Amino acid sequence: LPECAPATQGYELAEQSLRKRSRYESPRILDVERMTEEAGVSVSSVALSDTDVKALALAGGGFRPAVFMNERNPMVSSEQGRRFVLAHELCHLLHDRSYGRSLAMATGPWAPCGVEKRANAFAAMLLLPPALLEKHPTPKNPEEVRSLAATLRVGKRTLVNHLFNMGYIDAFRRERLLESL
């Protein structure tokens, strides 16, 4: 991809992944675990002492790409958080290594900012493509955000930020909704 903002690049990479799998126009909720399996990635849980680390993505010659979800991280304990973290790690495995090059990426507070922003945007677009969002009315208050986030199986903040990034809500509404969640 040409040089661009990490979030824009993440959105574009997710759109490419969805189109490649004929899921971009689908208004159905993505089974990210199945997509991960189809990509040949194994997913396991691990109990890391550092609770800030959400997951580890590993790939390289001689072994199958893998994601290890840190069961001690609070985000990974919810279905919505687990789906987002898995989609985020899938971005690292698909796009943060050249063919045949090894990758060891831990998602935590000290990970490279641009790489993490791109993976976050990838995860949001993968889980909330336009065809899925357009199927539902844009939430106008916190209760509608909670309801739609539960329906779409994503986090409330993920939903609000993605709606803003996609132009469904303005900056004022975004701030109001985030303050009230």
Model-flagged regions — what are they?
Residues 1-181:
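Short juxta-domain linker segments that transition from a proline/glycine-rich
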